[in-house]
């Protein structure tokens, strides 16, 4: 199944985070924070402005992004994988290599 977001929505696959602290302590799943980074897997057509024009999204498929800890509260399971659906404005930054 393929997910096609509408308007300024973005679909993100959350990155796997290390469950070990800097001191080498392994964190149980309940104590580990959810990662706030991910990869964009689908992008909507853009935001509709007040004058009716559509502003294209600033992110594209494949971008590595950082988002806030409470962003992407909409989780969708697609082919057994949890994906986040959020507005483009919930993305804080694009990670450039």
Curated annotation (Swiss-Prot):
Signal peptide: none annotated. One of its GO terms (biological process) is chaperone cofactor-dependent protein refolding. GO terms for cellular component: cytoplasm. It is found in: Cytoplasm. Keywords: Chaperone, Cytoplasm. It comes from the Bacteria. The keyword Chaperone applies. InterPro entries: Chaperonin_GroES, Chaperonin_GroES_sf, Chaprnonin_Cpn10_CS, GroES-like_sf. SMART domains: Cpn10. The keyword Chaperone applies. One of its GO terms (molecular function) is protein-folding chaperone binding. PANTHER family: 10 KDA HEAT SHOCK PROTEIN, CO-CHAPERONIN GROES. Heptamer of 7 subunits arranged in a ring. Interacts with the chaperonin GroEL. Belongs to the GroES chaperonin family. Together with the chaperonin GroEL, plays an essential role in assisting protein folding. The GroEL-GroES system forms a nano-cage that allows encapsulation of the non-native substrate proteins and provides a physical environment optimized to promote and accelerate protein folding. GroES binds to the apical surface of the GroEL ring, thereby capping the opening of the GroEL channel. This is Co-chaperonin GroES. The gene is groES.
């Amino acid at each position: 199944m393929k997910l096609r977001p509408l308007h300024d929505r973005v679909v993100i696959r959350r990155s796997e985070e290390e469950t070990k602290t800097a001191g080498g302590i392994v964190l149980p799943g309940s104590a580990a924070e959810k990662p706030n980074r991910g990869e964009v897997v689908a992008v909507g057509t853009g935001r509709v402005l007040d004058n009716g024009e559509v502003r294209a999204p600033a992110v594209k498929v494949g971008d590595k992004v950082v988002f806030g800890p409470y962003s992407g509260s909409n989780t969708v399971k697609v082919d057994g994988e949890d994906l986040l659906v959020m507005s483009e404005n919930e993305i804080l930054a694009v990670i450039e290599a």
